[in-house]
């Protein structure tokens, strides 16, 4: 990282109070240094880049005008909060960004008093800031609450619920709408079109402001014209939605014009009630490659800023996301009923090629997970075969729709659940720790977890051809490199696969933990079963394993509570079988950020951790099968 002399202004900012000591004339130069530091830092560590480059001036202006942390800034989603972290005393910690034990990639209350609300998912900021504004009013405290939300996040229903409540409460709340025409994928829908129309509403703005200046000198006319203005709005521009919700709307203004931002925010700080400031920014601003390709530079690994993101090497094996994307195109060619649905995650979920080849069958519904599942249910009612591509963590937002709109009606909707289990650097807000637990209890739902890429493809075909709802959950990144069969073959529903015959110990592996189970099985001489289906469970094979082994060990990259291991225990209890059990999975705590490998090792789900846990448990288990040698064998390191 460069020395302080490379950033003479930025190096003087240890907190926002230092920032507020600067003359306003120096703020543009500070913005240049902050943007350069961001590029140097994120290109070294990886992380979210384009969104942060786009919020440099806005972040400086907010901390310059408002008395943070007494005044509350609430960032929506939070991936654009790196400038905020840098200006609030965490500049020197940036080399540890998103690494185990280092800075979180999102605002985190435990990390800094300036992080007033923990975020990671979209569209929560207005609700949280409103809650803070209402708390201040009830407690008699004189402070401001500011929500900073993107135009993509504004498409979600929760944002409108909060706007509706805030307008009704006449709360002292400022909402800053950061309009960069992007979330992760390009924004879609009526809200995006509405904001575009506002941007072109220059005539209305000119007439309105000019009239106010004149009418200020004619008090008897002011009230008449106020009422007339409400009718004029609809004649000059589309109705100002935010004002109808009880907000005073200001803008749009240039989000990269620091003097204008500071002046406007100072004026708005002095006004009471609900206010909405519409600022227009450019994702990737100040770094040409990111401006030209904001999607590509949304989340980056390490790269050379002078070269930009190099064309990626062809991987030795595809990621699970790529396997899904190819399967979707293949199945779409085979079955014209297939439709693909995503809640604003076209790139992340692997739907780019599908959207290009089958545009009439591709539906990006915006950041609207609840709507995504219910619109899929409606399609399924009338003969289509919907496939919803969604991250595990975001599926949590649509749990009621899964039960009420899909499962109760037993509709043939396939959920392709990406980023299941341990995810890594994005931390607890993006971990897929809970899906097996909350899915397997839903009646009518078939739940599958592939152990490799080819099995993922076969499970997707299996779920697609079922007459009811199905879910296939797969992890982030690449699998073990299994050869892919180009066909669209299915698997027998509810049948596990015996992968290794051993004695004494049976390892029942669900999904991506299978390679680690196979590695741990060698020194144990353990039996290994690839369980494949969490629901319906292969109860016959579970019974066979229980009757022929001293210890059953369940393995899953899901929380132990209520997960696949619990399904095995429940099955044995129903069958009246008593056998020693060991459940290995994610512990009863939220995953912190770190690499996937580090987090799996910490949870004891790598080969070494499995081996150690099994050996410790065997000390308390009597032998029925002569497996004493696995206890006395020296522990050895198993390569990952």
Curated annotation (Swiss-Prot):
One of its GO terms (biological process) is 1-deoxy-D-xylulose 5-phosphate biosynthetic process. Keywords: Isoprene biosynthesis, Magnesium, Metal-binding, Thiamine biosynthesis, Thiamine pyrophosphate, Transferase. Pfam families: DXP_synthase_N, Transket_pyr, Transketolase_C. Homodimer. Its cofactor is Mg(2+); thiamine diphosphate. SMART domains: Transket_pyr. It comes from Thioalkalivibrio sulfidiphilus (strain HL-EbGR7). Binds 1 Mg(2+) ion per subunit. Binds 1 thiamine pyrophosphate per subunit. It is an enzyme of class 2 (transferase). This is 1-deoxy-D-xylulose-5-phosphate synthase. Belongs to the transketolase family. DXPS subfamily. It catalyses: D-glyceraldehyde 3-phosphate + pyruvate + H(+) = 1-deoxy-D-xylulose 5-phosphate + CO2. Thiamine diphosphate binds at residues 79, 120-122, 152-153, 180, 287, 369. HAMAP family: DXP_synth (MF_00315). The gene is dxs.
